[in-house]
């Protein structure tokens, strides 16, 4: 367990607002314009939420995120980083994660019982992850032809929906998986 007050201070966040953890997609910036569009749409909810946006190594993505922050009246509610080494800590204070459905981030989100908004999955495994998570009521996949504002409105302003997604996440996640794997290995 993490000291949440300390995490809010560490990232200069308000404990009085909900936090969205937003992963931009890494150094290749796949789906950059769509990613920027979704982040821009999320900034419409800064009266209730604050966003920790991680651009990855992609300098153009990072600059696009900063350009969004520059247009905001309340730019303090949008924190932009290339990288953070405290992902589990930030997840512990987050209400929602927006990410590509790669294995590591999804595993961390499940372990933190976080509802997930899926963006820009790579065809193949990531699309299969997105379909699976959506079928379990854990995630909502914002597809290419979807209107992100409609989807975000339905989730961000619907605490019942967020609670349901969180509950479904905790039903699927096995917080003892490491222990279980070690037990299996030790029996061999």
Cite the ranges covered by each PLM segment.
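C-terminal alpha-helical cap of glycosyltransferases
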Residues: 174-188
């Amino acid at each position: 367990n993490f000291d949440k007050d300390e995490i809010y201070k560490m990232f200069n966040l308000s404990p009085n607002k909900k936090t969205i953890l937003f992963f931009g997609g890494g150094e290749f910036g796949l789906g950059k314009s769509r990613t920027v569009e979704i982040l821009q749409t999320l900034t419409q909810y800064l009266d209730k939420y604050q966003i920790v946006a991680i651009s990855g190594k992609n300098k153009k993505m990072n600059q696009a995120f900063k350009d969004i922050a520059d247009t905001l009246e309340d730019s303090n509610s949008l924190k932009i980083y290339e990288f953070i080494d405290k992902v589990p800590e930030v997840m512990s204070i987050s209400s929602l994660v927006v990410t590509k459905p790669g294995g590591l981030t999804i595993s961390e989100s499940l372990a933190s019982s976080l509802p997930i908004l899926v963006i820009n999955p790579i065809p193949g495994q990531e699309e299969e992850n997105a379909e699976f998570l959506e079928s379990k009521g854990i995630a909502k996949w914002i597809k290419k032809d979807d209107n992100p504002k409609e989807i975000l409105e339905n989730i961000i302003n619907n605490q019942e929906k967020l609670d349901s997604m969180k509950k479904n996440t905790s039903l699927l996640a096995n917080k003892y998986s490491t222990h279980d794997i070690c037990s299996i290995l030790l029996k061999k």
